[in-house]
Structure formats: structure tokens, C-alpha cells
Regions:
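Beta-propeller-forming repeat regions
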Residues: 29, 116, 121-123, 187-188, ...
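Short, solvent-exposed loop/turn segments at conserved positions within beta-propeller repeat blades
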Residues: 16-22, 71, 124-127, 174-180, ...
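Acidic/polar residues in short coil/turn loops that connect beta-strands
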Residues: 4, 32, 62-63, 72, ...
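Conserved beta-propeller blade signature
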Residues: 6-9, 65-68, 121-124, 132, ...
Length: 276
């Protein structure tokens, strides 16, 4: 972002070629490849001992700040204090880190999705299924909602009628071998559920069924649609792509997949606004 030669990299595991390595988040200079900063995921401030970072951060270019959720249950708000010397080809950072932690009914949860932000409000879901809205000015919670299961998929976010709408979906992980995976539209200002859609999916200990990826929030000729991918539907191999009406959650079309997909679908548009 901003044209700065910085690379932001999170780890999902703590082993390389079978050998244990430190686990956390890295910032590298793309000028010389040197590591400029490391966040130790095994943070003593965290309620959770696992220190992976599966999601991407959001870089606030105006305020030179990185906002990053971790699987240790912390949200890191880091003022980078970047100094980029374009004449001599040097870049440095002096991070100042603030951390937010929380529990819900006595339980902590880690975040495996990327953070979604609108103005001063951040939105994320933990692996207990707790969707939370966070005030970034005060680092205090605004509201929370239980999605009923683990959520790896990053939220979709869209402005609508002077409010913020969130599109969220969960997996089938903690509720038995066969259960509904939910896709929901939620008012980002209040946490109120507008509608929900369910798709029966299978549990698999290796790769969970359900929604593991972000939806398409349609534009142009599909501006009325939000499109989700569900994995492991009728069995452990199959999947389903479903287009839902943004207004009411009704199915507009669906496509059964012979093999499931847990990547995010992508919409492409012509200059005339035709979608593919």
C-alpha cells in the first residue's frame, strides 16, 4: 500500500521442514529483504497460546497504521512510524503497538479471517463464531453476535441506505457430522440479523465443510446479489455456489459443484457493467 516497499507476512504454522520455528507476523523491506519487525504470536497478553496469523491486515495509509487480528485472540493496532527515503533507497519503521483482547461469556476465541473496517468500526469473527464490532478510537466493543460455529471467511461489507451491511458465513465444525452452514446479512451498526440462509454441509476433521471463503458482493448488473461458496454439501467432495438476493436472502440461482471449492469466488465486469 501507498507505494512503500513493505511486505506483510503472517504464519499459519510453527514448523519448517519438520523443525520448530518462532510463530508470528513479519514485516519485511522489499529493498533488501531484511525483516524490519516481528510480532511474536505467543503473546503473554493473549488469552490463547496459539500464535498464528491467517488473515491479512488493513493498512490505514493516512494514519500510517496497521490493524491486524490474530489467532491468539488479539487485535493489534500498530502505528508504524514509517520513514521512506526515496533518494537513498532506505525504509525504516518504528512500530508503536496497542493490543485489544476480550472474552465472551468467559471464553476467548482466535481470529482466522481478515479484518473488515468502515470508518472507525472494525468487524471480525473468531473461531467460536462470535462476530464482533469494535470501536477503533476507544478499543471498546460496540456489539457482538453468535454465528453458531467457527468462521474463517472474511466478512463482506457494503454501504446500504445510510448504514453498513455485513455478509457473514460459518463452517460446520463444532455441531456434529452434518449441520447447516449459515450465511447471514447483518446490520453493521446494530448487529441485527436481516436474513439468514442455511446450507446442509458435512464435517471433516481435516478441512471443515461449510463456507470457508468470502462472498461476492455484486455490482452493476448483479448489484442485487451476494454469492457464497459452500463446501462438502451432499458428501465430502461436493460443493454448491449460491446467489442470494441481498434484499431478502432468497435463492436467485444455485450451482451444484462436483468438487467443492473453498476459495472465494470472483466477479469480473466489462466496461458496460456485464458480469461474469
Amino acid at each position: 500500500p501507498r507505494g512503500y516497499p513493505l511486505l506483510y507476512v503472517g504464519q499459519g504454522i510453527n514448523q519448517v521442514s519438520g523443525e520448530a520455528v518462532r510463530l508470528g507476523y513479519h514485516i519485511f523491506s522489499l529493498i533488501d529483504g531484511k525483516e524490519l519487525y516481528f510480532i511474536n504470536g505467543r503473546d503473554k497478553f493473549a488469552y490463547i497460546g496459539w500464535g498464528a496469523f491467517d488473515g491479512n491486515p488493513l493498512i490505514d495509509s493516512k494514519n500510517d497504521t496497521m490493524i491486524l487480528p490474530g489467532e491468539n485472540g488479539l487485535v493489534y493496532v500498530t502505528k508504524l512510524n514509517t520513514n521512506y527515503d526515496t533518494v537513498n533507497g532506505n525504509i525504516t519503521i518504528k512500530p508503536n503497538v496497542t493490543r485489544y483482547r476480550y472474552t465472551k461469556n468467559g471464553y476467548a476465541g482466535g481470529m482466522e479471517n481478515s479484518i473488515a473496517i468502515y470508518n472507525n468500526s472494525a468487524f471480525f469473527i473468531n473461531n467460536n463464531g462470535i462476530l464482533q464490532a469494535l470501536d477503533l478510537n476507544t478499543l471498546s466493543p460496540l456489539w457482538s453476535y453468535n454465528m453458531e460455529d467457527d468462521c474463517d471467511a472474511t466478512l463482506g461489507l457494503e454501504e446500504e441506505n445510510n448504514t453498513i451491511m455485513l455478509y457473514a458465513a460459518c463452517e460446520v465444525d463444532k455441531r456434529g457430522t452434518v449441520a447447516p452452514a449459515f450465511a447471514k446479512k447483518i446490520d453493521g451498526k446494530t448487529g441485527q440479523v436481516i436474513w439468514e440462509y442455511s446450507c446442509i454441509c458435512q464435517y471433516d476433521a481435516n478441512v471443515n465443510g461449510g463456507a470457508l471463503s468470502s462472498p461476492i458482493i455484486g455490482k452493476n448488473d448483479i448489484s442485487n446479489l451476494v454469492i457464497f461458496n459452500f463446501s462438502k454439501t451432499t458428501n465430502l467432495r461436493t460443493g454448491k455456489m449460491v446467489a442470494l438476493d441481498k434484499a431478502n436472502g432468497n435463492v436467485v440461482w444455485k450451482k451444484d459443484l462436483s468438487f467443492y471449492s473453498w476459495s472465494s469466488p470472483v466477479a469480473c465486469y466489462t466496461k458496460e457493467g456485464k458480469s461474469y
